[in-house]
Amino acid sequence: MNVTIKNDIKIIHMGEKGPNVLSVTRSKEIIAELNYEECKAVIIMGNEKVFSAGLNLKDLMNAKEPEEVSLIFNTLSDLLVSFREFPGPVISIVGGHAIAGGCLIALASDYRYGMFGMHRMGLNEMAIGIDLPPDMLSIISHSISKKDLFEVATQCKMYTPKQAYKKGLINEYIGNPFIGKKKATAEALRRAKKLAGFYINAGEPFVRLKQSLMHDTEFDYEVLISNWFSPETQAKIKKVMSTLSKK
């Protein structure tokens, strides 16, 4: 992970290569970077192929105790909450796949830039038998309209960048493929810096407005953990892992 700060804007590159999985360690590293005393805005990026593939299924499969599974899911929840509780703007640049937890952290951002490409964006929790807790759903509900939220949350569709834009998963779409991915990313970064500067200049009114959009929703994670260890869910996960190992 690479982090730079300039003009009160912190840019977090989760990784130039690889799937940018949200391990407990990586999630805690990102949370630690959301420090309002160090910066007033955050831009988070992946790489040209993957923004983030979400939780590491291998970590989950290797977890033998409920406490281990609880730590993984609760840390993801903490990461999403940290995006919403950071007083300044958190802006995501989605230039590659944003799947499951990766999609969630993008949706937990205040604003999202997307671009052309073969990558996909979506939530697949229901397909593998994992609960999408109400607290996580509440966090993303400010990003997606009511008419699209149910479809996005339950049907496990993997949207193209243009479809993601139409569904509200991203706010701005850079759709000119002739400029190339690097220039598209640079353009998204330029726009993100400009928007971050605008919100920084807005000051306390923006901070108060962002705080007013927060919703307190409780969820018993013991339900999720119990479901994770059920034979049905384990069978689905093993099927997914088998498919991934063949790619």
Give short role names for the model-derived ranges.
Residues 1-45:
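Conserved CoA-thioester-binding segment of acyl-CoA-metabolizing enzymes
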Residues 44, 105-107, 164, 240:
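Hydrophobic/aromatic residues within transmembrane alpha-helices
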Residues 79-128, 158:
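Glycine-rich beta-to-alpha active-site loop
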Residues 114-119, 170-222, 238:
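C-terminal long alpha-helix characteristic of the crotonase
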